[in-house]
Every structure is written in structure tokens, then in C-alpha cells.
């Protein structure tokens, strides 16, 4: 079977990770990545051997910078079977008419709203519904985390209600123009936050309400989660359920902070210290009268990356079984949980 030809439109925090993850698979390949300016990220892409495409008006700038572009973004799209749009939130919506004109399958990120594709994706929750689709939205880092945790418990115990409080990192590490630096920001002030409805775009039967704040850190998000379940269980039962999932990591051995999780990722040799798994503190898991509580941490730069690969595989009909795709993706990128 020929490899699926994938274009990555936008080579920033998510795009560069998606490109590397796609390149690691044996059933898909990157035909090109796009950058608007010949900056350091474009230089790295050039050094890594990616064909760079740029807006037609900017091609000369890339030539002068010593990293000649392979062509325009439209030319990149013509070579691909599917485009993964990793542009900043709001830009993806503007790109949709271009994709429609070319007649290419497209994936957007969680910075866009659900209606852009009419379908929101999480591999553990609704992989099979994505098979053969032309348009898909991979949900955000926070929604991906909640969907992983909720769908895992829902399959085994049944979830009646979820209440979650999100402490969101302020910005990614390379975003020097944003904050807060010395403040905790209500985000949003009006409750509930948008994360609950976003979870329901994937798991429509879940009763969930969320609240969110921004805190002055760049490393990870942390959620405090309360679930009301339908079956009797113990904390040990919940640990075993979470521990059975390849994209959930139980973090212990003295780890009590996001800084230590990132250091652990560095120590085990993860590229860019990425932590693709949802990290749950097993000591925090508490069960009282069919209510369970726990903390989990979310590496916002990388948790959605394997999800994008699985979405490609489903949409291109390379694999109809979600569990098999997850296993294949994990193995290729080096996600070994245990």
C-alpha cells in the first residue's frame, strides 16, 4: 500500500511535532511543511530535510535566507492527500476555502471551533467514527486530557457526572510576548469554561462542567477532576483502570510537580522533553460513595501529537481499528508507558 502523503501547514509548537511523528510512521510521509517567514524554525526544518513551502509573496525572502522554498503553499497542497493545519487559532478557518478548492482532506487543531469540521476527534473515544472522513478537528490539549480520562473510566464504571477545575499554563515556553508573569488570571471569568462543551463534542452523553484559570508557568496544565460513577469501585480499581491505558501514565516515585514530570521526560530521552501521555498522580486518586477525585497534568505542547497521527490513519482508511492505530503510533514515536 502506498504511503499517505501528508502536508503540515504551520510549523510551530504543534506542527513541528506532528511532522516528526508522521515521518516516524511507515504508512504515511510528509510531503512538505509551511512557514510564512524564514525564521529559526524554518532553518531547523530545512536542516532536518523537510521541503519548505511558503506564501508565494515570501518565496524570495526564503531564497535570500539560504533556505530556498520548494514552492507555494498551494503547490504543497496539490502534492498531498491530507493536510494537517497547525496554524494559530483562527487562521485555520481562513484556510478552509483553500483546502476545499484543492479538494484535500483536512485536520484542524483545537484552536478552531467544532463547526469547522463538524466532527471532533479523540482516538480513545471515537476513532471509528473518523474512518474515511474528509474533515476532522483534533480537540485541544485540555480537552484531549479530559476525554482520555473520562472515556477510560466511562467504559469500565460508567460516568454520571464530571466536574473539573483547570489550572492552565500561561503560555508555551517560546512565547515571550505573552503572560501573565506575576498573576493568576480567571480564564474565563464567567463560568463555566468552554472545556465542558468541547468534551461533549467528542463524548456527547457526558454531563460535565469546567472552570479554568491561567497560572504563571509554561510547563504543563494541571486539572483537579471529580467524577461521579455508576458502579462501586475502590481507589485501587481506578488505578488499575488508568494503568491499563498506554496513553495514561501514573506518575509516582516522589513526583509532586509539573517540573519533575518534565525533568523525567528529559531523563528518559523524550524529544523536546515531550510527554504524550496524560499524567495522573495515583496517590491523589480518592473514592467516596461512587465519587472519585484525582489530579492530572497535561503537557500542552505534545499530548495532541499522537492524536493527529491516529486521525490521519482513520481518515485515510489505513486502519479501521482504533486500538491497532494507537499501538502502531505509539510504537513508531517511542511511547512506551511502562
Curated annotation (Swiss-Prot):
It catalyses: D-glyceraldehyde 3-phosphate + phosphate + NADP(+) = (2R)-3-phospho-glyceroyl phosphate + NADPH + H(+); D-glyceraldehyde 3-phosphate + phosphate + NAD(+) = (2R)-3-phospho-glyceroyl phosphate + NADH + H(+). Its EC number is 1.2.1.59. GO terms for cellular component: cytoplasm. One of its GO terms (molecular function) is 4-hydroxy-tetrahydrodipicolinate reductase. The keyword Metal-binding does not apply. It is found in: Cytoplasm. Pathway: Carbohydrate degradation; glycolysis; pyruvate from D-glyceraldehyde 3-phosphate: step 1/5. PROSITE patterns: GAPDH. It comes from the Archaea. InterPro entries: DapB_N, GlycerAld/Erythrose_P_DH, GlycerAld_3-P_DH_AS, GlycerAld_3-P_DH_cat, GlycerAld_3-P_DH_NAD(P)-bd, Glyceraldehyde-3-P_DH_2_arc, NAD(P)-bd_dom_sf. It is an enzyme of class 1 (oxidoreductase). The keyword Nucleotide-binding does not apply. Keywords: Cytoplasm, Glycolysis, NAD, NADP, Oxidoreductase. NAD(+) binds at residues 13-14, 111, 169, 300. Pfam families: DapB_N, Gp_dh_C. The active site is at residue 141. One of its GO terms (biological process) is glycolytic process. D-glyceraldehyde 3-phosphate binds at residues 140-142, 195-196. Homotetramer. Belongs to the glyceraldehyde-3-phosphate dehydrogenase family. HAMAP family: G3P_dehdrog_arch. NCBIfam families: GAPDH-II_archae, PRK04207.1. This is Glyceraldehyde-3-phosphate dehydrogenase 2.
